[in-house]
């Protein structure tokens, strides 16, 4: 058994993202690594729209999805708040208005596994959809 509960944690700061969060969530459920192997951590950063309710609904349906809430402090503050709670071997930061290609988590984690003692950071191409 691995010392990690998940292959990866996707940490998502959320602030007034009701317009985009659904597409973000959809991109995570379609990951080729298997959705059950990914932990999703939403950190609501004081949203005033329905973002928190959307994330809560998603977290109530899946045990690998959690919603944390805090007062607004900005993206970095939300990431720092969520990071200690992450249970994945690898941590991905994803903004609530972004999506991942369906093989991103698998490709990045496979790469990290192959160069585990040599590489500390990987970036990937971002494509705007709006």
Each PLM stretch: what is its role?
Residues 1-130:
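Nucleotide-sugar donor-binding/catalytic module of glycosyltransferases
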């Amino acid at each position: 058994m691995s010392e990690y509960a998940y292959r990866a944690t996707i940490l998502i700061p959320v602030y007034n993202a009701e317009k985009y969060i659904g597409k973000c969530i959809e991109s995570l459920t379609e990951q080729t690594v298997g959705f059950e192997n990914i932990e999703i951590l939403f950190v609501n950063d004081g949203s005033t729209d329905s973002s928190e309710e959307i994330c809560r609904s998603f977290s109530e349906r899946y045990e690998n999805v959690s919603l944390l809430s805090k007062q607004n402090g900005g993206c970095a503050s939300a990431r720092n708040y969520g990071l200690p709670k992450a249970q994945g071997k690898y941590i991905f930061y994803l903004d609530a208005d972004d999506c991942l290609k369906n093989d991103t988590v698998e490709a990045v984690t496979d790469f990290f596994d192959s160069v585990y003692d040599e590489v500390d950071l990987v970036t990937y191409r971002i494509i705007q959809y709006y």
